[in-house]
Amino acid sequence: MARKCEITGKKTMFGNNVPRKGLAKKKGGAGQHIGVKTKRTFKVNLINKKFFIPNLGRSVSIKVSANALRSISKIGLDAFLKKNCKKIENFL
């Protein structure tokens, strides 16, 4: 299964490791020198979480990012799904 949040759609991003050495010019140095850039991945912080749906009377297991889980705990699952244009039936 893909490493992707089922609600927000967040997934692995790609970028570079950029090693820097030297003192910055604004700190009185000769400037920072950048070495060889190497590829890297930024992985999503995913959690398999069970949510209880009271109007259906059952639990649903959803792979959700930590950021989305924080928002769900603040405003509730129904409101968060409505905000992200998702329906609970998609996760059954």
UniProtKB/Swiss-Prot annotation:
InterPro entries to which the protein is assigned, alphabetical: Ribosomal_bL28 (IPR026569), Ribosomal_bL28/bL31-like_sf (IPR034704), Ribosomal_bL28_bact-type (IPR001383), Ribosomal_bL28_sf (IPR037147)
Keywords: Ribonucleoprotein, Ribosomal protein
GO cellular component: ribonucleoprotein complex; ribosome
Any Gene Ontology biological process: translation
A single MF term (Gene Ontology): structural constituent of ribosome
PANTHER family in the record: 39S RIBOSOMAL PROTEIN L28, MITOCHONDRIAL, LARGE RIBOSOMAL SUBUNIT PROTEIN BL28M
Record-stated family: Belongs to the bacterial ribosomal protein bL28 family.
Protein name: Large ribosomal subunit protein bL28
Originating species: Borreliella burgdorferi (strain ATCC 35210 / DSM 4680 / CIP 102532 / B31) (Borrelia burgdorferi)
Lineage, highest ranks first: Bacteria, Pseudomonadati, Spirochaetota, Spirochaetia, Spirochaetales
